[in-house]
Structure formats: C-alpha cells, structure tokens
Amino acid sequence: MRGNSLSRYYESNKKFVISTLSSIDEQFKEELNNIDVHLYSGSANNLSEALWNIRKVLCHYANVVCPISDETIDAEGRKRKAKSSVCLNHIISALYQKVDKQISIELLDIGVTELWNKVEKLNALGIKGVRTKVTEDEAFQCVSQLYVLLGQMIRIFN
C-alpha cells in the first residue's frame, strides 16, 4: 500500500515538475524526456547519459533561477572561468536568499549537494574508465532525487 502511494507521489510530482519547467522554458521538456529515454533503454552507456542529462537539467535550472556568466571575478578581482560546480552554488545561494526557514533550506542544500556530488562522481569514474557501468539502481535513485528536489525548489520559488 505504501509503495503505491509513493509511486503515485513520484508520478504526480514528476508531471508537476515537467509541466512547470516546460512553461518556463521548452528546453526543459526535451532535457527531462532525454533522461527517461536513456534511463529506460537500460544499457550502461545510456544510464551514464541519463546522469549526464541530470547534470544538464540542474545547470539549466541554475541558469533560469540565477543566471551565471562565463567568467567570475575572484576576491582579488581576477577573472576566472566558471566551473560546473558554480551551477550548484547558484542554486544553493538562491535557495538561501528565498527561504526564511533555515532547517528546510539546509535539508534542501544537503539534498541538492548530495545529488550533484553523486552525479559528478559517477560521471568522473566513468570518464576515467575506473567504472564504466552505472547500475540501474544508481541511475533510478538519482532521477528520483532530481524530481523530488526540483519539485521542492519549484514550490519554494513560486
């Protein structure tokens, strides 16, 4: 019984995320669809692609919420290239600015950071050839986390 409720929650949250983000930018619909296409094909390469697409969605979301530039200025006034982790920092910074409740923001911060780090680590290992196969469980867990976190963030920013 509980599994069915969680499954219904996931599906309704997923629909909410897709429709809301698609209304902001149609590219989200394509990116989120690509995750499903890669996820359900089941091959090791496609599971890795699903993780890469999760990363793209998070970066795209960061650009929509808090646009980042190609260059950042460090504390000494020098221009630096923005790294991909800047996307994560922009999401977290925007969350802290938007929400008054410290505990809920810290939980979201932990969730977003954990998902980002997991996707980065799995991608890095795959690129180095250390571990070429992402398991289905790892991929499904990351996708589930993505939709839950995006749903929470959308509700916060609306």
Label for each model-derived stretch:
Residues 23-33, 38-158:
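Amphipathic, oligomerization/interface secondary-structure segments
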